[in-house]
Amino acid sequence: MRLELHQLSARHPAARPAAAPAIRDLALQIGAGEQVAVIGPSGAGKTTLLQVLACALPPSAGTFTVDAQSPWQLPRRALQRLRGRLFLAPQVPPLPPRQRVVTAVLAGRLPAMGLWQSLRSLFYPADIPAAFDALDRFDLADKLFERVDRLSGGERQRVGLARALLSPASLWLIDEPLSALDPTRSRQAIGTLVDTARERGATLVATLHQVDVALAHFPRIIGLRDGQLAFDLPSAEVTRARLAALYDQFEHELRGEVPVTAPGESSGQQPVVMHCR
């Protein structure tokens, strides 16, 4: 999918009328098959940008097109079909607590299924080997038949990412996928996503707080601050000076000072859920 934003601004639906837009005057082009990381301090507008790209939040000014089409000018059914071509992984995966992991992972295929097939898959998983392989890429194969509510926060986050590997989507939008993972798990998870997206020719846009991981795995880096574009560069051209300016007064985020309480997991803080529909 090719994404284009022209002087785009967007405001959160719950924001006060006088509040500044969460993102403003953004001009970006993301080509089909690109892998792009979006970085910046807290409150920079990263999640809002993903909401716009997910066709979940209409722009308040400017234009947004997907493959040269404006999503918000499409008929409702056509908009639903377009949303079915993208995969959105929010910070907190919306996994039913009593569901088996195998069912949760195979839910990544639901957009390509009919109603009857979707309902049947809730009780009779259709492709257990595929679910096993996807989980194995994230070192979770042993959790295949575990219940979701028995997983740790980091394991649930990786189950949410494993869904992407089974999704038929050509656009993957991943919001802070590493918030519950330690550095080793983080690098493994991002490496798996980037490599798989590249193999399939899928467009991947991920928001990240872990700048070192973004620079190591993504060929293109977009920096946001205060809702505006700070830079859009190949990763090799993102200098320390640019990062220092981007994270001015937020140096602790640039240093990655996130408390980790156990191998593979974070302190358990729960980020805000982002819904796409």
Predicted regions and their residues:
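Conserved ABC ATPase "signature" region
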Residues: S118-K143
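Catalytic Walker B motif of ABC-type/P-loop ATPase nucleotide-binding domains
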Residues: W172-D175
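H-loop/switch region of ABC-family ATPase nucleotide-binding domains
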Residues: L208-H209
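Helix-to-loop junction immediately C-terminal to a conserved catalytic motif
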Residues: A54
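ABC ATPase NBD coupling module
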Residues: P71-F87, Q117-Y124
